[in-house]
Amino acid sequence: MRRTFFKAKIHRATVTHADLEYEGSVSIDEDLLEAAGIWEYEAVHVWNITRGTRLQTYAIKGERGSGIICINGAAAHLNRPGDMVILATFAELEEAEARDFKPTVVLVDRQNKIVAKDAVEVPGPARRVTA
């Protein structure tokens, strides 16, 4: 049986742009995409920590090293520059491959620069990233 598992996330990224006129998607700095193992055009959940909104779109490559997180199209109504978001992906896995699977967690600072990768998720305030 296949089950859906959390695959990767870019945690507490800062929205740098919101482009209502673009067709759709979320532009993500290519360095962040690679670190998280997220492919261009892969489905991405955008969970807005600041506003409490959630949506699903797809990733496109943003300029490498720029720190860009640009919410495009109609989703720009739900996300604004300065908002903090979690960008997450999921994967369907067979039971055998799921047993040893570990998701990729990329932590970023307020400029969307990587501060940790493959972090172990620990609930509670001790886990907060304030860099």
Curated annotation (Swiss-Prot):
Cofactor: pyruvate
Protein keywords: Autocatalytic cleavage, Cytoplasm, Decarboxylase, Lyase, Pantothenate biosynthesis, Pyruvate, Schiff base, Zymogen
Binding site for substrate: T57, G73, A74, A75
Modified residue annotations for Pyruvic acid (Ser): S25
Record flagged with keyword Nuclease: no
GO molecular function, one term: aspartate 1-decarboxylase activity
GO biological process: alanine biosynthetic process; pantothenate biosynthetic process
Catalysed reactions, as listed in the record: L-aspartate + H(+) = beta-alanine + CO2
Subunit comment: Heterooctamer of four alpha and four beta subunits.
Name of this protein: Aspartate 1-decarboxylase
Originating organism: Anaeromyxobacter dehalogenans (strain 2CP-C)
Lineage: Bacteria, Pseudomonadati, Myxococcota, Myxococcia, Myxococcales
